[in-house]
Amino acid sequence: MGTPFKMERGVKYRDAAKTSIIPVKNIDPNQELLKKPEWMKIKLPANSAKIDSIKNGMRRHGLHSVCEEASCPNLHECFNHGTATFMILGAICTRRCPFCDVAHGKPLPPDPEEPRKLAETIQDMKLRYVVITSVDRDDLPDRGAGHFAECVKEIRQLNPNIKIEILVPDFRGRIEQALDKLKDNPPDVFNHNLENVPRLYREIRPGADYQWSLKLLKDFKAMFPHIPTKSGLMVGLGETNEEILQVMQDLRDHGVTMLTLGQYLQPSRHHLPVARYVPPAEFDEFRDKAQAMGFEHAACGPFVRSSYHADLQAKGEIVK
């Protein structure tokens, strides 16, 4: 028998090193991929002074953006717009979802200075709306909830007029403890992504539980009825439209009023392949049905991501 694979703490495992240890091994890096349709082709602009400024500001304070770590296709647009989604608690995730480009591994302990550095960076950037997300930290007793709370507290102390959206993991097995940590420093928008349909969870979200994620959204809403709750979904992973509509209804049944729906894009050949490219007209239909279900805001489009133009979503403007 060969030597068992042993991860080193603080090392980022990506692509084949990451997806080789998922429970459902159905990724063939040599398989023929679907050709991107014209509506999925975007022209990336050359790096601008605004993009360089945001990147340099993050590097200077030792911070991370999910825009870079997850290889988001909207990075250039958002950075040029002067917005970014900050990723706290390091850049190594304890989960190994095969749709995601964030590195897997054994993360380092949280940086106790990160909340202060984050608040100072946001102040320097003169942001009015900020999204804070994180990797999964199943290694921490509170799954990182206390660190989220400290970040919100520090940001508000230096930026009293800012609006804060947090995009949180599922706090596996620690929902009650996590919400207790957040109760004194709640955000302006609480976001937790269901990602896709429950039938595909074992394949695409190993370690997650669909009902647990719904419970997190419902329990937060019960604790803070005045704060909007939000969730995001990807399409193109093998789900049916009927399954997506059922997930949307489940979200409404659990008090969620904001929805994002976008096309899944394969980060590399070592990730799950795209099963289908959904035409823009179908996204328009999803948005119409979301509004009919009672969602107050529904951003639906091929390039929509959970934090894409989150400031405009929060204002109720149409994003697609």
From Swiss-Prot:
The gene is lipA. [4Fe-4S] cluster 1 binds at C67, C72, C78, S307. Its main location: cytoplasm. GO terms for cellular component: cytoplasm. Binds 2 [4Fe-4S] clusters per subunit. One cluster is coordinated with 3 cysteines and an exchangeable S-adenosyl-L-methionine. NCBIfam families: lipA (TIGR00510), PRK05481.1 (NF004019), PRK12928.1 (NF009544). It catalyses: [[Fe-S] cluster scaffold protein carrying a second [4Fe-4S](2+) cluster] + N(6)-octanoyl-L-lysyl-[protein] + 2 oxidized [2Fe-2S]-[ferredoxin] + 2 S-adenosyl-L-methionine + 4 H(+) = [[Fe-S] cluster scaffold protein] + N(6)-[(R)-dihydrolipoyl]-L-lysyl-[protein] + 4 Fe(3+) + 2 hydrogen sulfide + 2 5'-deoxyadenosine + 2 L-methionine + 2 reduced [2Fe-2S]-[ferredoxin]. Its EC number is 2.8.1.8. Pathway: Protein modification; protein lipoylation via endogenous pathway; protein N(6)-(lipoyl)lysine from octanoyl-[acyl-carrier-protein]: step 2/2. InterPro entries: Aldolase_TIM (IPR013785), Elp3/MiaA/NifB-like_rSAM (IPR006638), LIAS_N (IPR031691), Lipoyl_synth (IPR003698), rSAM (IPR007197). GO terms for molecular function: 4 iron, 4 sulfur cluster binding; lipoate synthase activity; metal ion binding. Transmembrane segments: none annotated. Keywords: 4Fe-4S, Cytoplasm, Iron, Iron-sulfur, Metal-binding, S-adenosyl-L-methionine, Transferase. This is Lipoyl synthase. Residues 79-296 form the Radical SAM core domain. Belongs to the radical SAM superfamily. Lipoyl synthase family. SMART domains: Elp3 (SM00729). It is an enzyme of class 2 (transferase). It is found in: Cytoplasm. [4Fe-4S] cluster 2 binds at C93, C97, C100. Its cofactor is [4Fe-4S] cluster. It holds the Pfam family Radical_SAM.
